[in-house]
């Protein structure tokens, strides 16, 4: 099986219960996770690390993580004999308040490495041949007062967890990318806004990775500039048809 197939199977493995109760101290105290999305995103990245390392080693890949904060990607995989065929893996997390809601992710900046080959990226962008997203989706559970206390190892079953119903997928970034910025005035690429199965099946809006890259390399930062150029995929294709005018 391929690296990708093995990784997908490992992520879907029913033995991966994604059942973290909290953070344990050297004294044996367990601190419940709480509902902070940044904390939970870190937890799911920790889930992914040993899976990625195990499958990568099986296929002869080296795994590197960024030495600088906010550098892309979370994991770089490559074979020493093929340094210009690197694979980027980024871990993304989102939540729903009830099951089967539509979901959306932010997929990284559009003004950094896709425009400047070496900006905020572990290796030059043109050394990567694939960009994969491992996406985690969970349903939020209302925080209870019991999450404010600490526990010991004998009280594991009493510790409230702020999430349930974890789902995971692996997909190419360009396949699940949308045509709108991630949120507000940020310069992040937004994903499609769709159901979980649409991410699994890759029901995106771009015809190719080249179209995705060209769209986001030319996407303007402000709405005023976009109004003179394009705001969405339909307007982009018209812009192309007009000779980029």
UniProtKB/Swiss-Prot annotation:
It holds the Pfam family Endonuc-EcoRV. Its EC number is 3.1.21.4. Homodimer. Changing residue 185 to D/A/Q: Loss of activity. SUPFAM superfamilies: Restriction endonuclease-like (SSF52980). Changing residue 70 to Q: Decrease in activity. Keywords: DNA-binding, Endonuclease, Hydrolase, Magnesium, Metal-binding, Nuclease, Plasmid, Restriction system. One of its GO terms (molecular function) is DNA binding. Binds 2 magnesium ions per subunit. CDD domains: EcoRV-like (cd22323). It comes from Escherichia coli. Changing residue 188 to A/Q/T: Decrease in activity. Mg(2+) 1 binds at residues 74, 90. Its cofactor is Mg(2+). It catalyses: Endonucleolytic cleavage of DNA to give specific double-stranded fragments with terminal 5'-phosphates. Mg(2+) 2 binds at residues 45, 74. Transmembrane segments: none annotated. This is Type II restriction enzyme EcoRV. Changing residue 74 to E: Decrease in activity. GO terms for biological process: DNA restriction-modification system. The keyword Nuclease applies. The active site is at residues 74, 90, 92.
